[in-house]
């Protein structure tokens, strides 16, 4: 039987696994396509899985991706979790056990590092004030070179502003760790996508700081979501599996 994998969790978070060595149903959590989820014990860990068929493989769409995330979020309420990428499958019981066994030290270290932690997600949208290319009385070649120089200058200015904003956010929220990406939107604005790793106990304090940030940084449009499982902070090591 093939298994679809959602995440790795701590075995001791699920009392029903204390007396069993075989997969046990995880009550109250529905998997992809309405399938029953199971707790698959593997040493000190548990892998949350559901049965997977060839027909299921043809139905892996955006709705399925959302269901995948919902299962991980439900498990996160019960345990530290290490999310698997959407679409991760294992051919059979032995394949799943081998993967966990070969990555045991890596998985355990991640669980220890992320225990009691959560991810908060900030989107910060600001005007991109870098000037556009001005067309003067220049030849085609001169315009091209001028465009290249101005593009490079805009990119440097954009990166400098992104770093300044990122530092401001870091000082304001004081996360344990952070992952930041910056891009220019189609509307010409600059979007900072910020993931902050924080202690579970400080979620309310973080939310209060966000409320203050909205008042202090009126030139920015901000959006907060979370707490989430720490997707951005799981140190990846390719597990051996059949996908």
Task: Tell what function each PLM region has.
Residues 1-243:
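An interfacial alpha-helical scaffold signature
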